[in-house]
Amino acid sequence: MTDRVSRRAVLGSAAGLAVAAGSAGLARGGKPRRPNILWIVSEDNNPFIGAYGDAMAHTPTIDALAKKGLLFRNVYSNAPVCAPSRFGILTGVYPESCAPANQMRAVATLPKEFRTYPELMRAAGYFCTNNAKTDYNCNVNAKAIWDIQGKSAHWRARTATDQPFMAVFNHEATHESR
């Protein structure tokens, strides 16, 4: 997991993902069908799962999902603690670029030109849900950026069954504060 990745490899992977996403799910008649996205978040557990090669870990469900989906092998955290890291994921920028978002229990004012990834996904036609962990260290209203957020949020709540979804499930059992 700590292999160095060149800029060329990152750009090549991004281009490959863009091509794959653009052609994913072509239905009869050539009409593209966008993929559903299930994003599972598990904090503070390191790569101690079978899918990452840990021989001691018994994680058959996660391993099966990893085989069928997309497993990120070269990853890092953009912040050493949870909420600033979520800020980076939410906005796509380093938490330090919008101080004090890089500090725990701080509230940064998000610049007007910033767009969060749920806003972008919704603009692209996705139904977006998040079941927990909406402390982003900034003045974002979680209820405004997600179609549904909260403990009972689920992609099945969408009214159009042909609408693609992006569902974020935050598993809190591994969180350091638990």
Residue positions per predicted region:
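Formylglycine-dependent sulfatase
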Residues: 2-178
